[in-house]
Amino acid sequence: MRTRLVDFDAVGWLKRAAKAAGAFAVVSVCLVTFAQAETRTLKLYNTHTKERVSITFKKNGRYLPDGLREANRFLRDWRRNEMTKIDPELLDLVWEVYQKVGASQPIHVVSSYRSPATNNMLRKRSSGVAKNSQHTLGKAMDFFIPGVKLATLRATGLRKEVGGVGYYPRSGSPFVHMDTGSVRHWPRMSRSELARVFPDGKTLHFPSDGKPMSGYKVALAESKSGRSRSSKPTI
């Protein structure tokens, strides 16, 4: 019995593979170049001081010192008029969420930086204020955007998997919390609710039953390799 060998053009296959890889590389470079060429501007409104501002904090992949200083000023602890250095990645996170939801109205800031004194004062009033809040580190913002459902903001923030996402639909002024700390969310969503946000189960977020979603290991591997977050730009 003779076995028929299938002809295999190794050279041709390598050429096609190289061509495909080259095309992929070109697309990747184009995407990176496009991202670096962006001008990132945040339109903000402080719900307490009534201040309005438009801050351009990044251009051509680089953070702008003047824009960062203006963000530090605007997102200050308004109660004590104290400032800190706001995490530039927080600005990126909020900007990317804003773009993703297709918003057009200014972002209404409820809270951002909190001095330790202000945080301690608020902790005495509410058990929902963390002792080591990301707000005290300049890494958090509580906000809402007129015309955008709060649930949509939460889902978009969850998908970014950059840090924490809090959901406060019953607050006097309903808002979401986003920070650049560890990946987590509250209140914990049920498994079915989280599955609607992540149909493939690929997420670092844990549902209320405390068990990881089906794609957790893949999400964790991507997170460790840096694929889930963009590389840090230059300041």
Per-segment meaning from a language model:
Residues 3-22:
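Bacterial N-terminal signal peptides that target proteins for export
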Residues 32-37:
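Sec/Tat signal peptide C-region and signal peptidase I cleavage site
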Residues 40-45, 129-140, 145-235:
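Catalytic cores and adjacent binding grooves of peptidoglycan-active enzymes
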Residues 106-121:
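Acidic helix-start/capping segments at beta-turn-to-alpha-helix junctions
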Residues 117-133:
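Charged, often glycine-rich, active-site loop that binds/positions anionic groups
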